[in-house]
Amino acid sequence: MSERLLVLVRHGQSEWNLKNLFTGWKDPDLTAQGVSEAKDAGRKLKAHGLSFDVAFTSELTRAQHTLKLILDELGQPGLPTSKNLALNERDYGDLSGLNKDDARAKWGEEQVHVWRRSYDVPPPGGESLKDTLARALPYYVQEILPGVLNGQRTLVAAHGNSLRALIMVLEKLTPEGILKRELATGVPIIYRLKADSTVESKLDLAG
């Protein structure tokens, strides 16, 4: 029986993560630490004896760069890769590019907290987590999952909120449950799935 392997990894630290800015669909690259995190992710996957048949990523540089560095570490630089905006980070709209402390000063700490941590309240001109899930989930179900179930060993390098969409369906989490889930930068999560697409095992390679 072929292995139903799905590995998710959030991009390494970006320049705007470091500066405490809302990033969303803005396109900063990785910091030196982010590069190191991505390479380390590749080394960890290699140490677990993993290789892949296909990869998916977003249309944003920080996720694509993370994927490239991981594949280089695995010795798979030419792996077939699909890039799609469905896997892009949540669009923070008018908050994009703002320092998080400055945003709190402008709109108030409580309002910014609602935009960041509620499930269905978007910031001005942006997306809620629910909106992000509405584009990421169909892409997962239609484009990623069928290959996994057919034995394609699959790697997804994306963003905290788009990966939350995949984790929500994989782990059958409620909106409240997924809001509490924090994803560290550059840390692979290894899922092995059953034939019915539910999770057989999960291994988080943190540390």
UniProtKB/Swiss-Prot annotation:
Keywords: Gluconeogenesis, Glycolysis, Isomerase. GO terms for molecular function: phosphoglycerate mutase activity. Substrate binds at residues 10-17, 23-24, 62, 89-92, 100, 116-117, 160-161. It holds the Pfam family His_Phos_1. GO terms for biological process: gluconeogenesis; glycolytic process. The keyword Disulfide bond does not apply. Signal peptide: none annotated. Catalyzes the interconversion of 2-phosphoglycerate and 3-phosphoglycerate. PANTHER family: PHOSPHOGLYCERATE MUTASE. Belongs to the phosphoglycerate mutase family. BPG-dependent PGAM subfamily. This is 2,3-bisphosphoglycerate-dependent phosphoglycerate mutase. It comes from Bradyrhizobium sp. (strain ORS 278).
